[in-house]
Amino acid sequence: MCRRIFKEQTSESGDIPFYKIGTFGGQADAYISSELFAEYRSKYPYPKEGDILISASGSIGRTVEFTGNNEYFQDSNIVWLNHDDRLDNAFLKCFYSVVKWAGIEGSTIKRLYNDNILNTVISMPSVAEQKKIGTFFKELDNIITLHQRNCICLLSL
């Protein structure tokens, strides 16, 4: 997870988008300086391009694929899984969309802790099969998005 950013370290405009749990997967409404970003990125864990970021608070399980752009994420509310080459990120994104996280059902304030993630068993087919599954669902998501856009266009006629 990224290092905590305090409100006084952000501004409404600036160099580096800062995503909080409410803006994660959307448009940033806060920014941090390039200097702070460079310092924190060099000192603290930071995702790699292609990593799947996951919301651990609020709308638990919302995922975003990290594009590699210069942007920063709210401390323990947005996390990612560092893993080896036995797990494909596109497959992991599909898995995150269907997993039932143990230990969070019924709690008043929903929160996904490291133990919830680390103790979750992931059935892992071969990497080649994971890639096929991940690619299939990514293409399916793209087709659904295109059809939704077409529906919006048709409704606006």
Regions found by a protein language model. Give the residues of each.
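Feature detects amphipathic, helix-rich regulatory segments
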Residues: 1-157
